[in-house]
């Protein structure tokens, strides 16, 4: 049976506007793959070659979300975590399917399964593929004052730049992303800086930063190995990608503007509720409760890159006129 890859809204494979991948590939549909293995040691991984439908749609999905650095981003390898390559891996696939069915029954037939990127080092992703997520992975979000609750954080597939900016480069200049299937069920909004670590009630299954346009999926530790299924590893190079200490990219060659000036300009372009969220985050930064990179992260999440870029551009132009 030929492998088939579709988009979640059942449109053409070339249409990635909604940023989601619907996986209708049968587990044994491994056409156009190399069984020579990937750079990772897990026996469950197979290397997908150019021309393989899964390889091509994942490559397109990642690059389409990389924004200004997409033209300088090179996909090196894409490896599939195959259920046909080991009893344990097969069991994880079956368990994920059972949990999908259970959540679907809970919510009238829709388990709300999405794809999300998880950023980590090569060793971290190797460990997750082999053993699953652990408290160590939860811990890095627990110590981040800007995170949306304490759990495993993933980024929607359409927001690959946000995920890529949190990757670590290895000695060969490679970065790694883990594309996972994620059972969201019914999510609830989790505010930045929240220390929530489990659903607020039995009604909810997961967390998001925004119900309508989420940039963060939060899976609680109690569900991290039942509601997240690691599916593909992507290794890539992106020389223009800039990663701050906290894991968020800055735009190349951006003109400088102080936070105080940026806050003043944002206040004329944003609604009060979003502006108040940025003000509270900025206040935490001034009190040294959060790091600079965490403030930048929150500004980008709330205001959006397009608005920030326009404000900085206008600020630069005004300075030219003044000078």
UniProtKB/Swiss-Prot annotation:
Coiled coil: none
Domain PARP catalytic, chain residue ranges per copy: 31-257
Family annotation (Gene3D superfamilies): 3.90.228.10
InterPro entries named in the record: Poly(ADP-ribose)pol_cat_dom, RCD1/SRO1-5, RST
Keyword DNA repair: no
GO CC annotations on file: nucleus
Domain (RST): residue spans on this chain: 250-321
Role description: Probable inactive ADP-ribosyltransferase that may be involved in stress and developmental responses.
Name this protein carries in UniProt: Probable inactive poly [ADP-ribose] polymerase SRO2
Organism: Arabidopsis thaliana
């Amino acid at each position: 049976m030929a492998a088939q890859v579709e988009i979640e809204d059942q449109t053409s494979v070339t249409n990635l506007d909604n940023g989601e991948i619907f996986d209708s590939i049968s587990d044994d549909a491994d056409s156009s793959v190399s069984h020579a293995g990937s750079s990772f040691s897990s026996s469950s991984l197979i290397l997908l070659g150019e021309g393989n439908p899964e390889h091509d749609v994942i490559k397109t999905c990642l690059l389409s979300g990389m924004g200004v650095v997409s033209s300088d981003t090179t996909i090196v390898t894409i490896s599939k975590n195959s259920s046909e390559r080991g009893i344990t891996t097969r069991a994880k696939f079956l368990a994920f399917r059972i949990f999908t069915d259970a959540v679907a029954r809970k919510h009238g037939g829709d388990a709300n399964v999405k794809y999300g990127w998880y950023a980590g080092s090569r060793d971290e992703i190797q460990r997750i593929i082999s053993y699953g997520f652990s408290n160590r992975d939860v811990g890095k979000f627990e110590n981040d004052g800007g995170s949306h609750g304490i759990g495993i954080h993933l980024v929607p597939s359409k927001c690959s730049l946000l995920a890529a900016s949190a990757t670590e480069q290895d000695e060969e200049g490679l970065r790694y992303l883990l594309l996972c299937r994620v059972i969201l069920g019914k999510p609830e909004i989790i505010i930045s800086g929240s220390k929530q670590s489990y659903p607020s009630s039995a009604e909810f299954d997961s967390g998001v930063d925004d119900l309508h346009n989420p940039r963060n999926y939060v899976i609680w530790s109690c569900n991290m190995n039942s509601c997240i299924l690691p599916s593909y590893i992507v290794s890539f190079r992106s020389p223009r990608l800039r990663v701050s200490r906290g894991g968020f990219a800055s735009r190349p060659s951006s003109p400088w503007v102080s936070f105080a000036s940026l806050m003043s300009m944002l206040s004329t372009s944003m609604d009060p509720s979003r502006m108040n969220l940025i003000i509270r985050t900025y206040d935490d930064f001034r009190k040294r409760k959060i790091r600079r990179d965490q403030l930048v992260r929150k500004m980008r999440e709330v205001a959006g890159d397009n608005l920030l870029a326009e404000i900085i551009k206008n600020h630069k132009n005004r300075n030219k006129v003044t000078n």
